[in-house]
Amino acid sequence: DYIAGMLSDAPHTRKIRPGMRIAITAGSRGIDHLAVIIRELVSFLKEQGALPFVIPAMGSHGGATAEGQLAIVHEYGVTEEFVGCPVLATMEVVKIGELDVGRPIFINRLAAEADGIISLNRIKAHTAFRGSYESGVMKMLTIGLGCQQGAEVCHRQGILHLGENVEKFAFGILKNANVLLGVGIIENAYEQTAVIRVMTGE
């Protein structure tokens, strides 16, 4: 009810139309109540007539294989039976653009083929780099949806440039892909869900 209330009380549903296939990201980090949050999001989207599905979005984690990444999200309870929609995985990527320095922007093929994307992730400070956007919905776009190839391109300049590259690639994805919403989760000091916020792609 909490998630549905946030979505229905805001202008976020204007872009969600019946029949739209919408990809929801699920990462490799253990997020409190992840499966429940995804289930409620799926339920709301289905009420709008959309056709949601979940994709593991975790760069090269899970051994950089679709099977390995599916196993990770299944361990977190994100299964078709629980969340109420297909849970699909691929490591194939599609080039959707380039940065001004000629570096390719890659995203997961399933996300690229969807009518819309919802980037869902926990927002927190990163342990290895600093930047305007650290761990959160923007890094999920760049590293998570980038799969192994996208993550490698972003990391190529080293950890010192990772903060700026996460931002650059994320804005490139926002420009070239239909990112409908971001769902940001903030946990308290006990790693319990404290705040959930929904943002438009803009």
Set out the residue ranges of the language-model regions:
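Short glycine/serine/threonine-rich phosphate/pyrophosphate-binding segments
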Residues: I31-I38, G63, H126-F129, M140
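Short glycine-rich or small-residue beta-strand-to-loop segments that form or flank ligand, phosphate
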Residues: R21-G30, F53-M58
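Short coil/turn connectors at secondary-structure junctions
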Residues: P18-R21, Q48-L51, F82-C85, V101, ...
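Active-site histidine-anchored catalytic micro-motif
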Residues: L51-E67
